Protein backbone atom coordinates (compact mmCIF):
# COMPACT_ATOMS: atom_id res chain seq x y z
CA UNK A 1 0.00 0.00 0.00
CA UNK A 2 1.46 3.36 -1.03
CA UNK A 3 1.29 6.62 0.92
CA UNK A 4 -1.61 8.02 -1.12
CA UNK A 5 -3.69 4.89 -0.48
CA UNK A 6 -2.96 5.09 3.25
CA UNK A 7 -4.02 8.77 3.33
CA UNK A 8 -7.27 7.98 1.50
CA UNK A 9 -8.12 5.15 3.91
CA UNK A 10 -7.34 7.32 6.94
CA UNK A 11 -9.58 10.11 5.64
CA UNK A 12 -12.50 7.90 4.64
CA UNK A 13 -12.43 6.13 8.00
CA UNK A 14 -12.55 9.50 9.81
CA UNK A 15 -9.81 8.50 12.22
CA UNK A 16 -8.50 10.90 14.85
CA UNK A 17 -4.81 10.50 15.62
CA UNK A 18 -4.97 12.34 18.96
CA UNK A 19 -7.32 14.11 21.38
CA UNK A 20 -5.23 17.26 20.82
CA UNK A 21 -5.80 19.46 17.76
CA UNK A 22 -2.73 18.96 15.52
CA UNK A 23 -1.13 22.41 15.34
CA UNK A 24 2.38 23.42 14.33
CA UNK A 25 4.62 25.16 16.87
CA UNK A 26 4.46 28.38 14.80
CA UNK A 27 0.67 28.29 14.32
CA UNK A 28 0.10 31.68 15.95
CA UNK A 29 2.97 33.72 14.55
CA UNK A 30 0.92 35.25 11.73
CA UNK A 31 -1.72 37.88 12.42
CA UNK A 32 -5.33 37.42 11.31
CA UNK A 33 -4.76 39.89 8.47
CA UNK A 34 -1.65 38.04 7.28
CA UNK A 35 -3.48 34.73 7.34
CA UNK A 36 -6.40 36.14 5.35
CA UNK A 37 -4.04 37.56 2.72
CA UNK A 38 -2.16 34.26 2.42
CA UNK A 39 -5.29 32.11 2.22
CA UNK A 40 -6.88 34.47 -0.32
CA UNK A 41 -3.89 33.90 -2.62
CA UNK A 42 -4.24 30.12 -2.37
CA UNK A 43 -8.03 30.10 -2.87
CA UNK A 44 -7.58 32.28 -5.94
CA UNK A 45 -5.02 29.79 -7.28
CA UNK A 46 -7.34 26.83 -6.63
CA UNK A 47 -10.27 28.44 -8.44
CA UNK A 48 -8.01 29.48 -11.32
CA UNK A 49 -6.70 25.91 -11.60
CA UNK A 50 -10.28 24.64 -11.76
CA UNK A 51 -10.88 26.93 -14.72
CA UNK A 52 -13.11 29.50 -13.02
CA UNK A 53 -13.25 33.04 -14.43
CA UNK A 54 -12.29 35.21 -11.47
CA UNK A 55 -13.17 38.40 -13.35
CA UNK A 56 -16.85 37.43 -13.18
CA UNK A 57 -18.81 39.62 -10.74
CA UNK A 58 -20.02 36.54 -8.85
CA UNK A 59 -16.51 35.17 -8.33
CA UNK A 60 -14.10 38.05 -8.07
CA UNK A 61 -14.69 38.54 -4.35
CA UNK A 62 -14.80 34.82 -3.52
CA UNK A 63 -11.12 34.31 -2.58
CA UNK A 64 -11.25 37.05 0.06
CA UNK A 65 -14.68 35.96 1.32
CA UNK A 66 -13.46 32.39 1.78
CA UNK A 67 -10.25 33.52 3.46
CA UNK A 68 -12.12 35.73 5.94
CA UNK A 69 -14.64 32.96 6.60
CA UNK A 70 -11.85 30.47 7.35
CA UNK A 71 -9.95 32.72 9.74
CA UNK A 72 -12.76 34.62 11.47
CA UNK A 73 -15.66 32.18 11.39
CA UNK A 74 -15.54 28.45 10.71
CA UNK A 75 -11.95 28.02 11.97
CA UNK A 76 -12.11 30.78 14.58
CA UNK A 77 -11.75 28.18 17.34
CA UNK A 78 -8.08 27.77 16.40
CA UNK A 79 -7.35 31.17 17.92
CA UNK A 80 -6.57 30.95 21.66
CA UNK A 81 -7.97 34.43 22.26
CA UNK A 82 -11.39 33.15 21.14
CA UNK A 83 -11.49 30.62 23.98
CA UNK A 84 -14.46 31.44 26.24
CA UNK A 85 -13.92 32.47 29.84
CA UNK A 86 -14.54 29.45 32.06
CA UNK A 87 -15.30 31.22 35.32
CA UNK A 88 -17.31 29.09 37.74
CA UNK A 89 -19.53 29.88 40.71
CA UNK A 90 -19.93 28.29 44.10
CA UNK A 91 -22.85 25.89 44.23
CA UNK A 92 -24.37 27.88 47.10
CA UNK A 93 -27.80 26.26 46.76
CA UNK A 94 -26.19 22.81 47.04
CA UNK A 95 -27.79 21.43 43.90
CA UNK A 96 -26.52 17.86 43.94
CA UNK A 97 -28.18 16.32 40.91
CA UNK A 98 -27.14 16.08 37.30
CA UNK A 99 -27.25 19.21 35.14
CA UNK A 100 -27.77 18.63 31.42
CA UNK A 101 -27.62 21.12 28.55
CA UNK A 102 -28.99 19.30 25.53
CA UNK A 103 -29.51 19.95 21.83
CA UNK A 104 -26.58 22.35 21.57
CA UNK A 105 -26.13 23.05 17.87
CA UNK A 106 -22.82 21.83 16.44
CA UNK A 107 -21.34 23.36 13.28
CA UNK A 108 -17.88 22.00 12.60
CA UNK A 109 -15.66 21.00 9.67
CA UNK A 110 -14.26 17.57 8.88
CA UNK A 111 -10.48 17.88 8.85
CA UNK A 112 -10.12 15.13 6.24
CA UNK A 113 -12.19 16.75 3.47
CA UNK A 114 -12.99 20.24 4.83
CA UNK A 115 -16.72 19.60 4.53
CA UNK A 116 -19.32 20.50 7.19
CA UNK A 117 -20.26 18.47 10.24
CA UNK A 118 -23.72 19.47 11.49
CA UNK A 119 -25.46 18.07 14.55
CA UNK A 120 -26.34 18.34 18.21
CA UNK A 121 -24.34 17.98 21.41
CA UNK A 122 -25.72 16.95 24.80
CA UNK A 123 -23.50 17.86 27.75
CA UNK A 124 -23.97 17.06 31.43
CA UNK A 125 -22.10 17.25 34.71
CA UNK A 126 -22.55 16.60 38.42
CA UNK A 127 -21.33 19.46 40.59
CA UNK A 128 -18.70 18.86 43.24
CA UNK A 129 -19.10 22.39 44.59
CA UNK A 130 -18.72 24.49 41.43
CA UNK A 131 -21.20 25.32 38.67
CA UNK A 132 -20.91 26.86 35.22
CA UNK A 133 -23.21 29.43 33.67
CA UNK A 134 -25.49 27.56 31.26
CA UNK A 135 -24.31 29.46 28.18
CA UNK A 136 -20.70 28.46 28.94
CA UNK A 137 -21.42 24.90 27.84
CA UNK A 138 -22.74 26.16 24.51
CA UNK A 139 -19.65 28.33 24.11
CA UNK A 140 -17.29 25.44 24.88
CA UNK A 141 -18.98 23.34 22.20
CA UNK A 142 -18.80 26.21 19.71
CA UNK A 143 -15.12 26.96 20.45
CA UNK A 144 -13.90 23.41 19.89
CA UNK A 145 -16.23 22.89 16.91
CA UNK A 146 -14.92 25.95 15.05
CA UNK A 147 -11.79 24.27 13.69
CA UNK A 148 -10.87 21.39 11.38
CA UNK A 149 -12.16 18.52 13.51
CA UNK A 150 -12.86 14.85 14.01
CA UNK A 151 -16.04 14.12 15.95
CA UNK A 152 -14.37 11.78 18.43
CA UNK A 153 -11.79 14.44 19.29
CA UNK A 154 -14.44 17.15 19.57
CA UNK A 155 -16.41 15.03 22.04
CA UNK A 156 -13.33 14.41 24.18
CA UNK A 157 -12.18 18.05 24.09
CA UNK A 158 -15.55 19.28 25.33
CA UNK A 159 -15.47 16.86 28.27
CA UNK A 160 -11.83 17.60 29.13
CA UNK A 161 -12.39 21.37 29.07
CA UNK A 162 -15.37 21.12 31.39
CA UNK A 163 -13.50 18.77 33.71
CA UNK A 164 -10.67 21.31 33.99
CA UNK A 165 -13.06 24.19 34.63
CA UNK A 166 -15.22 22.39 37.19
CA UNK A 167 -12.48 20.42 38.92
CA UNK A 168 -14.39 17.17 38.59
CA UNK A 169 -14.27 14.06 36.41
CA UNK A 170 -18.08 13.83 36.45
CA UNK A 171 -18.75 15.18 32.96
CA UNK A 172 -20.38 13.58 29.92
CA UNK A 173 -20.96 14.51 26.29
CA UNK A 174 -22.81 12.87 23.41
CA UNK A 175 -22.75 14.25 19.87
CA UNK A 176 -25.04 13.12 17.05
CA UNK A 177 -24.01 14.68 13.74
CA UNK A 178 -24.17 14.38 9.98
CA UNK A 179 -20.91 14.51 8.03
CA UNK A 180 -21.20 15.97 4.56
CA UNK A 181 -18.05 14.09 3.58
CA UNK A 182 -20.22 10.96 3.98
CA UNK A 183 -23.51 12.49 2.81
CA UNK A 184 -22.35 14.36 -0.31
CA UNK A 185 -19.31 12.38 -1.55
CA UNK A 186 -17.85 8.89 -1.33
CA UNK A 187 -20.68 6.60 -0.24
CA UNK A 188 -23.20 9.50 -0.56
CA UNK A 189 -25.38 8.23 2.29
CA UNK A 190 -27.71 11.13 3.09
CA UNK A 191 -29.55 9.36 5.94
CA UNK A 192 -26.78 8.20 8.28
CA UNK A 193 -25.43 10.15 11.24
CA UNK A 194 -22.51 9.57 13.59
CA UNK A 195 -22.88 9.30 17.36
CA UNK A 196 -19.91 9.71 19.71
CA UNK A 197 -19.82 9.73 23.50
CA UNK A 198 -17.36 10.45 26.28
CA UNK A 199 -18.22 9.61 29.90
CA UNK A 200 -16.09 10.65 32.85
CA UNK A 201 -16.21 9.87 36.57
CA UNK A 202 -19.67 8.95 37.86
CA UNK A 203 -21.02 8.83 34.30
CA UNK A 204 -19.14 5.55 33.83
CA UNK A 205 -21.68 4.02 36.24
CA UNK A 206 -24.40 2.36 34.10
CA UNK A 207 -27.23 3.79 36.23
CA UNK A 208 -25.90 7.36 36.06
CA UNK A 209 -25.33 6.98 32.33
CA UNK A 210 -28.89 5.70 31.93
CA UNK A 211 -30.25 8.76 33.78
CA UNK A 212 -28.24 11.05 31.47
CA UNK A 213 -29.65 9.30 28.40
CA UNK A 214 -33.19 9.59 29.78
CA UNK A 215 -32.78 13.35 30.20
CA UNK A 216 -31.62 13.65 26.60
CA UNK A 217 -34.71 11.83 25.36
CA UNK A 218 -37.13 14.20 27.12
CA UNK A 219 -39.27 16.22 24.70
CA UNK A 220 -38.70 19.83 25.76
CA UNK A 221 -39.74 21.64 22.59
CA UNK A 222 -41.52 24.87 23.48
CA UNK A 223 -42.71 25.98 20.05
Go through each PLM region and give its residues.
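A domain-level signal for the structural core that forms small-molecule/cofactor-binding pockets
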Residues: 1-223
Amino acid sequence: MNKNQEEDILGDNHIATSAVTPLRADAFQMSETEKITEIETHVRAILHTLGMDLTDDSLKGTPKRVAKMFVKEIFGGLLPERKPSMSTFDNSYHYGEMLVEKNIVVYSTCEHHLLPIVGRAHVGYISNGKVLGLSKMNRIVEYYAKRPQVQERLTMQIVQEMQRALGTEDVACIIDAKHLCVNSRGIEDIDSSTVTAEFGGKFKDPEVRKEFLEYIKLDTRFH
